[in-house]
């Protein structure tokens, strides 16, 4: 029995050492990926590239309910975390470990913006770590509203629409500032899975996603249940 216990202790120790070594390696690789990316093209340069586009929309030209919907469904702790939502990442990490792959990202708005600016959509641990380093830098240089503004101007909405203005014009035939509450909450749900929720492909799925958006808005006190129901029955 004592021999068995010793063997178990040794195996546990080996696993811990191997785990620490693997984590250290991934962190080092992720940091290198982040440094290489920003040295090649600084964040400020990337940001100005987006802001200079003809279809760029400023945050004060967007309906407040649209912004609230985005935050509710994508990153409800956006205004309180430092660029990375540790709780969301921890929950996602547990699910990833169970599945033995990156099945759940846990990325918030800032991390998604970093991915859109620099990285591919391919799910890799090193890329996720690079996003974390870049998110901290982005949050040091820009306000939350500036980050949210950049986010909605760089995310994909399906049907070849890569910003909120193109999506609003393409799906509804109007500028973002003219979207009503129904359109705003409908559009907010699409970027989670644009190929699935694109209104030109799967309108029924998009409306199911909209219900999820409204549920989140009620949960995080952006809307009352009565207001959410009124929007759905618009």
What does each model-identified segment do?
Residues 1-234:
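Juxtamembrane regions of bacterial inner-membrane/periplasmic proteins
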């Amino acid at each position: 029995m004592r021999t068995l216990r010793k063997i178990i202790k040794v195996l546990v120790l080996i696993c811990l050492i191997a785990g620490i070594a693997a984590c250290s390696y991934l962190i080092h690789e992720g940091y290198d990926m982040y440094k290489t990316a920003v040295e090649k093209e600084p964040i400020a340069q990337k940001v100005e590239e987006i802001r200079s586009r003809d279809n760029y929309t400023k945050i004060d030209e967007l309906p407040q309910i649209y912004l609230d919907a985005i935050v509710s469904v994508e990153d409800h702790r956006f205004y309180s975390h430092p660029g990375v939502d540790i709780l969301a990442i921890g929950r996602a990490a547990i699910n990833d470990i169970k599945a033995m792959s990156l099945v759940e990202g846990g990325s918030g708005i800032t991390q998604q913006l970093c991915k859109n600016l620099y990285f591919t959509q391919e799910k890799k641990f090193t890329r996720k770590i690079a996003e974390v380093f870049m998110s901290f830098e982005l949050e040091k240089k820009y306000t939350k509203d500036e980050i949210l503004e950049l986010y909605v101007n760089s995310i994909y909405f399906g049907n070849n629409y890569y910003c909120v203005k193109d999506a609003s014009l393409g799906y509804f035939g109007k500028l973002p500032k003219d979207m009503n509450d129904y359109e705003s909450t409908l559009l907010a749900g699409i970027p989670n899975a644009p190929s699935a929720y694109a209104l030109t492909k799967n309108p029924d799925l998009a409306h199911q996603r909209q219900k999820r958006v409204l549920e989140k808005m009620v949960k995080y006190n952006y809307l009352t249940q009565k207001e959410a129901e009124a929007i759905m029955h618009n």
